[in-house]
Design a protein with these regions (language model features):
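Class I SAM-dependent transferase core
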Residues: 1-47, 77-94
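Class I SAM-dependent methyltransferase "Motif I" SAM/SAH-binding loop
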Residues: 50-53
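S-adenosylmethionine
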Residues: 57, 66-70, 74-148
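Aromatic pocket-lining residues of Rossmann-like dinucleotide-binding sites
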Residues: 60
C-alpha cells in the first residue's frame, strides 16, 4: 500500500488526482476508500466507475491481487496514471478502460459482467445506480460509496 501511496503522491503533483498533497492525507484517502470494502467484502469481478486515482479499486486489488477488477475512467490523464500504477504494482488482474459509464450505452464488454460495482464521488446516488445497473450480473450488488 505504501508503494501505491508514493506513486499517487508523485502523480498528484503533476495532475490533480486527490485533494491531499502529502503522504498522510493520501493514506487517509486510501483507508477511507477501503472502509466499505472491509464492511461488505465485495465479490468479483468488480467494476469501479470513475476510477480517477484508483480509489477504491487499486487498494482492493492490492489486498486481492488475483481479483478481476476493471477501472472505468473517462479522462486520459487519469487512465495514464491508472495504467502506470497497475504496472508498477504488478496488478495483472486489473484492467483499465478509458470511457464513460452511460445508462443509455454502457461501454461494450461491461454489460452484465460484474458482481460488484464501486464508485466515489461520481454522481448523485440515483444516477450512479442507473449507471451501475446495466453492468451488474444477475444477483450482483454494489457499493455506491460516500459522497463528500
Amino acid at each position: 500500500m505504501e508503494r501505491y501511496c508514493s506513486i499517487l503522491l508523485e502523480w498528484n503533483r503533476a495532475i490533480r488526482l486527490v485533494g491531499p498533497k502529502d503522504a498522510a492525507g493520501i493514506r487517509e484517502q486510501i483507508v477511507d476508500s477501503l472502509l466499505p470494502y472491509l464492511l461488505m467484502k465485495p465479490s468479483f469481478p468488480l467494476l469501479d466507475i470513475g476510477s480517477g486515482a484508483g480509489l477504491p479499486a487499486i487498494p482492493i486489488a492490492i489486498l486481492n491481487p488475483k481479483a478481476d477488477i476493471v477501472c472505468l475512467e473517462p479522462r486520459a490523464k487519469r487512465t495514464s496514471f491508472l495504467r502506470h500504477a497497475v504496472r508498477a504494482l504488478g496488478l495483472s488482474a486489473v484492467s483499465i478502460v478509458e470511457g464513460r459509464a452511460s445508462a443509455l450505452d454502457p461501454p461494450e464488454g461491461l454489460i452484465g459482467k460484474f458482481s460488484t460495482v464501486t464508485a466515489r464521488a461520481v454522481s448523485e446516488i440515483e444516477t450512479l445506480l442507473a449507471l451501475a445497473r446495466p453492468c451488474l450480473a444477475p444477483g450482483g450488488g454494489g457499493d455506491p460509496g460516500p459522497r463528500w
